[in-house]
């Protein structure tokens, strides 16, 4: 850390960062919405709406509900604002936190020019946009990681313990967004030892540097404890447990040896372009470290930026190989490497511009080129891909490490990022998906409908086989933890083990793309001694057609009545009586 905070960021830098979300929204209008069929993202959206009910009666305790550092801000947003306004405010807050924190970090290491370049590149990089724009927890992990390091560097530089305490609070929030983020702690802790040369330059060398380090660590740890205690109070207030984090810890231990989503070998690399950038920056940073001409320009801050990326990457690789697997193959875990990758890009690879007019031009070209690549036509495909794409990305980043002039370096980096957008847009997870905005509206309307009938206890969903609206149904049922509540997805076909999930008093929701799909309920469940009392029928309109929701309460049928109902050729749910 060699750059003093006293070198204030130019005003036009602040304006550029303030305009960045608007540019992203113009290029990717639906960036604040989750994929309509993304199960886990909608699970957390459900917690935003129903934290107290889920924590106390409906789903206690699940490891999903332990991610309170992400759930609580979402809960506040969705209980103060309308769904659309809540989504905008929530995701803009985390997006801006991440971008501004990255700018602050790189500015302290390499100056404001490199900081602005890396912040703009990060803010317009598609995996970062998607991570910070959907309701899954990886965006929260990214934002809290960058905020942790930004506050820590500010606190250590000025010897202000309250900033170190605040950094600890952010670290606790990172941990309680996903307990696996504990593996990023080593990459944060390496920033604690004092940079003696930098302190001497500014006349801040303490008499006992290691005692000062110990005190900073204590204050930082105190921040983590304070964050955990605060979330424990929230958990108890919502009807949950004070040790809200334990289900996540136990789940992680159980998953240590077996992961049903694991992939073997290395063939997955060619199909995972989100892995290309961290891998390329990793290699390029090592090139910058190993080359004599590059090593001479590496300050302590730049060395730590490289070490943080290398350390986190090695931990991820070991975790992927020796742990539960599929970590680097899964884009919402690989995204955790983005903070360290873009810190290294800004601190090590971008270089330091000395001419302000060139700096302005480079940032403008970078922003416009990357924004254009975000609207890359789906019909256009880059000639290279797979392993050739990975090799090309590594080659371009390595070139950036050996080029001496900052402007050519940045041109090469931007070219690599634009190429990555081309390969990413060809994948199902990052490619065009026109139903994000409509899915958000439909699912939130669906939540309003379901909430009129389902209050405290878990519902059970009976789904007819999907035709063209299955992604809407998957998103809506994910609000209610999907596999926890779906009894059958082929209704009226119901297996005995599925039927046993429905007992007298259970509230059942039949979702179908045709009207009267709930009619066979009595006939199907008569052998199990149940009939259905219709509570209501609703229609949920999507841009592709309507969904029909029928709400029933399962009632116990006496054995004689059940046998008669089973023999009946035509059966329908018992109508609600006045």
PLM features: what roles do these ranges have?
Residues 198-199, 273-317, 341-352, 392-402:
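Hydrophobic, aromatic-rich transmembrane alpha-helices
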Residues 73, 194, 212-289, 314-320:
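Membrane-lumen/periplasm interface segments of specific transmembrane helices
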Residues 28-37, 51-75, 79, 84-85, ...:
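Membrane-proximal lumenal/periplasmic loop motifs of glycosylation machinery
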Residues 118, 163-178, 186, 226, ...:
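Membrane-interface alpha helices of multi-pass inner-membrane proteins
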Residues 372-469, 572:
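Membrane-embedded, lumen/periplasm-facing catalytic core of multi-pass transferases
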Residues 133-140:
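Short acidic/glycine- and proline-prone juxtamembrane loop motifs at membrane-interface regions
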Residues 89-109, 147, 151, 287-288:
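Transmembrane-helix motifs of polytopic, lipid-linked glycan transferases
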Residues 110, 148-164, 174, 197-201, ...:
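Membrane-interface transmembrane helices that cradle and orient dolichyl/undecaprenyl
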């Amino acid at each position: 850390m060699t750059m003093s905070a006293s070198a204030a960021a130019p005003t036009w830098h602040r304006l550029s960062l303030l305009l960045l979300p608007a540019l992203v929204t113009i290029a990717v209008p639906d960036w604040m919405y989750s994929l309509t069929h993304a199960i886990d993202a909608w699970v957390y959206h459900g917690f935003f709406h129903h934290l107290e009910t889920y924590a106390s009666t409906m789903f206690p305790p699940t490891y999903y509900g332990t991610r309170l550092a992400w759930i609580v801000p979402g809960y506040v947003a969705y209980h103060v604002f309308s769904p659309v306004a809540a989504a905008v405010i929530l995701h803009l807050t985390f997006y801006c936190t991440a971008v501004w924190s990255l700018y602050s970090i790189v500015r302290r290491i390499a100056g404001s020019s490199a900081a602005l370049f890396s912040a703009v590149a990060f803010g317009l990089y598609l995996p970062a946009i998607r991570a910070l724009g959907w309701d899954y927890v990886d965006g929260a992990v990214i934002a809290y990681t960058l905020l942790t390091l930004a506050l820590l560097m500010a606190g250590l530089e000025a010897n202000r313990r309250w900033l170190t305490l605040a950094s600890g609070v952010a670290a606790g929030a990172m941990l309680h967004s996903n307990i696996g983020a504990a593996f990023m702690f080593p990459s944060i802790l390496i920033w604690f030892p004092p940079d003696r040369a930098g302190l001497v330059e500014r006349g801040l060398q303490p008499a006992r540097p290691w005692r000062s380090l110990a005190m900073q660590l204590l204050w930082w740890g105190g921040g983590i404890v304070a964050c955990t205690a605060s979330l424990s109070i929230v958990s108890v207030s919502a009807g949950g447990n004070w040790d809200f984090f334990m289900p996540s810890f136990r789940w992680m231990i159980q998953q240590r040896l077996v992961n049903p989503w694991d992939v073997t070998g290395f063939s997955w690399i060619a199909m995972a372009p989100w892995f290309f950038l961290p891998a390329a920056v990793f290699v390029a940073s090592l090139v910058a470290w190993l080359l004599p001409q590059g090593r001479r320009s590496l300050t302590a801050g730049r060395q730590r930026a490289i070490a943080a990326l290398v350390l986190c990457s090695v931990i991820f690789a070991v975790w992927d190989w020796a742990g539960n697997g599929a970590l680097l193959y899964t884009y919402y875990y690989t995204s955790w490497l983005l903070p360290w990758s873009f810190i290294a890009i800004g601190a090590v690879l971008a270089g330091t511009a000395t001419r302000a007019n060139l700096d302005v031009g480079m940032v403008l070209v970078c922003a416009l080129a990357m924004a254009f690549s975000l609207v890359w036509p789906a019909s256009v495909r880059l000639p290279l891909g797979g392993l050739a794409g990975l090799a090309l990305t590594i080659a371009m980043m390595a070139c950036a490490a050996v080029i001496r002039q900052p402007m050519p370096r940045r041109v090469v980096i931007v070219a690599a990022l634009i190429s990555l957008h081309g390969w990413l847009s060809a994948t199902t997870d990052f490619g065009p998906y026109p139903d994000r905005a409509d899915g958000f509206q439909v699912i939130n309307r669906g939540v309003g409908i379901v909430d009129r009938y389902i209050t405290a206890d878990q519902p059970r969903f009976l789904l007819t086989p999907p035709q063209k609206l299955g992604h809407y149904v998957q998103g809506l049922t994910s609000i209610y933890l999907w596999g926890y509540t779906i009894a059958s997805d082929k209704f009226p076909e119901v297996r005995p083990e599925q039927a046993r999930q429905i007992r007298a008093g259970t509230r059942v929701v039949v979702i179908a793309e045709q009207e009267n799909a709930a009619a066979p309920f009595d006939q199907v469940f008569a052998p199990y001694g149940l009939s259905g009392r219709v509570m209501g029928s609703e229609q949920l309109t999507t841009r592709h057609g309507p969904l029909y929701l029928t709400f029933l309460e399962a009632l116990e049928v006496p054995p004689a009545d059940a046998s008669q109902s089973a023999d009946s050729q035509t059966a329908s749910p018992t109508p609600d009586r006045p």
